[in-house]
A protein has these predicted regions:
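Residue-level recognition of short, solvent-exposed, well-ordered loop/turn junctions
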Residues: 28, 70, 76-83
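Short, structured beta-strand/loop micro-motifs enriched in basic residues and often containing a Trp
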Residues: 13, 48-52, 62-72
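Non-catalytic DNA-recognition/assembly elements of restriction-modification systems
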Residues: 12-43, 173, 223-246, 251, ...
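A short glycine-rich beta-alpha junction/loop motif
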Residues: 12-15, 109-115, 148-174, 300-303, ...
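Short amphipathic coiled-coil heptad-repeat segments
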Residues: 1-22, 192-232, 377-400
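Short, basic/aromatic beta-hairpin or loop at an interaction surface
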Residues: 53-67, 109-110, 252
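Amphipathic alpha-helical segments
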Residues: 24-28, 167-202, 222-234, 346-385
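A short beta-sheet element
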Residues: 79-138, 151-152, 262-321, 326, ...
Length: 400
């Protein structure tokens, strides 16, 4: 039986070990320096847009990022990139601890700091190597070459010669082109899904504005058919059970029977609870003060969390999103939202409970649709990431 199985199995492709990764035997490897040309062209006296690299985003206008334009000797030493050129930002970040490499795709030319390693691919398919860099292929090698620690300017201790000594795969050119084509198609699909998600989020924002009365008005701009008449102004505290600040005492555990609610989400677990019901919650102090989230059940609530408890909170939730309780935050330091302020807050409500239900149902369905699109987008990104790893290292081969 074993012989039959082995006979039926196709021969495994031959592999060879490199300093970078295990690759198909017909793929070559080479130092980055052998396929790229370092860029040394400086700005000098020319006026060229200055850009920087933002981890996870790519190239961004430097004035927009830092709030100022550069001039003088420092600017003159900036490196000129042309469309299709690459830059490696040696600044470390949480998502890119070994720095990140991006390609200039949406500008004809631009100037980048001369502390970046800037280069263009002169041998091989630039699209293939863009995908290789985006996949983080160099990270393991960079980690081994970086002198531990970060310099005073926030850059990693990595010399240019060490960066360019990193080994990269060099598949047959036709295969490079086919791999790049497949992964670029994935990027296009991701871009379309991101656009659709942005459109849905913008739709939600617009309808929150139009389906609730504007300040000083008692009817919304848009209503469902069959509903007329003015909305009423009511005290928020009169429409809910209670508004308060969490007072639970606890030592968070990684597991337990009951959830502990913090300023933005669940922060741990405990074996006892202090509160039970349906809640709207927000941070009491800090950058998240005024950002609402929902939760139901038996819970503990931290002292940095303001909560609203009640029944049928759907309409209240969307009414408060329209109102934007961040406007209630105050203080010269960090933003602060007080339960006492919320208790005195007025909100506009339809007299007809059916209209409240119709509005709540509409937004609940829209939020559900946004969640589905968000999940689909993340799944597509994961699929592309996995596919890139398989294709870029030859684990899965494609016809050139």
């Amino acid at each position: 039986m074993a012989n039959m199985i082995y006979t039926a199995m196709p021969a495994l492709p031959k592999k060879h070990h490199t300093n970078a990764v295990v690759l198909p035997s017909e793929w070559n490897t080479c130092p980055l320096s052998s396929i790229v040309e370092e860029i040394s062209e400086t700005v000098g006296t020319r006026k060229i847009e200055t850009i920087s690299i933002s981890a996870g985003i790519g190239f961004v206008n430097q004035a927009e990022k830092f709030g100022r334009e550069l001039s003088g000797k420092q600017y003159e030493k900036y490196i000129v990139l042309h469309k299709g050129d690459f830059s490696y930002n040696k600044g470390n970040s949480n998502i890119y601890p070994q720095g990140c490499i991006y390609r200039l795709n949406n500008r004809t030319e631009a100037a980048v700091p001369n502390v970046f390693e800037s280069f263009r691919v002169s041998v091989g398919n630039p699209d293939y190597y863009e995908q290789l860099f985006l996949s983080g292929f160099l990270n393991r090698q960079l980690y081994s070459k970086i002198n531990r620690g970060v310099r005073d300017n926030g850059l990693l201790n990595l010399k240019g010669k060490d960066f360019y000594s990193c080994e990269v795969p060099y598949p047959p050119l036709a295969e490079q082109e086919r791999i790049a084509e497949i992964l670029i198609q994935c990027d296009h699909v991701i871009e379309l899904k991101e656009q659709k998600l942005d459109e849905l989020k913008q739709l939600k924002k617009e309808f929150l504005r139009k389906m609730f009365p504007a300040k000083g008005c008692d009817t919304p701009e848009i209503r469902f058919p069959g509903f007329t008449g003015a909305w009423e102004q009511r005290k928020l505290i009169d429409e809910v059970t209670s508004i308060d600040t969490g007072k639970s005492k606890f030592t968070p555990q990684k597991s337990g029977v009951y959830e502990i609610l913090g300023s933005t989400s669940v922060i741990g677990y405990d074996d006892s609870y202090d509160y039970e019901g349906d809640f709207l919650l927000t941070a009491r102090v800090g950058a998240n003060a005024g950002e609402l989230y929902r939760h139901s059940g038996k819970v503990k609530i931290s002292d940095n969390t303001v909560f609203i408890k009640g029944e049928q909170l759907d309409f209240i939730y969307y009414a408060l999103l329209h109102f934007d309780i961040k406007r209630l935050s105050f203080g010269t330091g960090q933003p602060l939202v007080k339960a006492s302020e919320l208790k005195t807050q007025d909100i506009m409500m339809p007299v007809d409970s059916d209209e409240r239900s119709a509005i709540s149902t509409y937004f609940s369905n829209l939020v559900h649709l946004i969640t589905l699109h968000q999940r689909e987008l993340e799944e597509t990104k994961t699929y592309k990431k996995t596919l890139a790893k398989l294709l870029l290292t030859g684990i899965v081969r494609v016809q050139g």
